[in-house]
Amino acid sequence: MTTNNLVLAGTITRSRQFDSPAGIAHTVVMLEHKSQRYEAGMLRNVYCQIQVVLSGEHFNSVSKNLKAGVEIQVEGFINLQQSRNGQNRLVLHAENVELKT
């Protein structure tokens, strides 16, 4: 087994909730991260957007608060997802979510 763990904080830019055909509750948010980090002794601006998927009943209480503008910290694993048009992207599957605001 190899390690696949990511912790990322940021601001939700959009959110949607739905139930799968199997009846599993899902919340999908777009998380925008902005920070500054040192790399090779130089300060660098860091920016990314990543889709975050929260699946299952244990996220029901937090999911109702996940709206655009809310700051969160997410811990989970990343997985490659292929869209209907064949585009690949990394998606963060949440295992823990903390509201920051």
Swiss-Prot record:
InterPro entries: NA-bd_OB-fold, Primosome_PriB/ssb, Prisomal_replication_PriB. One of its GO terms (biological process) is DNA replication, synthesis of primer. It comes from the Bacteria. The keyword Amino-acid biosynthesis does not apply. One of its GO terms (cellular component) is primosome complex. Pfam families: SSB_1. Belongs to the PriB family. Involved in the restart of stalled replication forks, which reloads the replicative helicase on sites other than the origin of replication; the PriA-PriB pathway is the major replication restart pathway. During primosome assembly it facilitates complex formation between PriA and DnaT on DNA; stabilizes PriA on DNA. Stimulates the DNA unwinding activity of PriA helicase. This is Replication restart protein PriB. It comes from Shewanella halifaxensis (strain HAW-EB4).
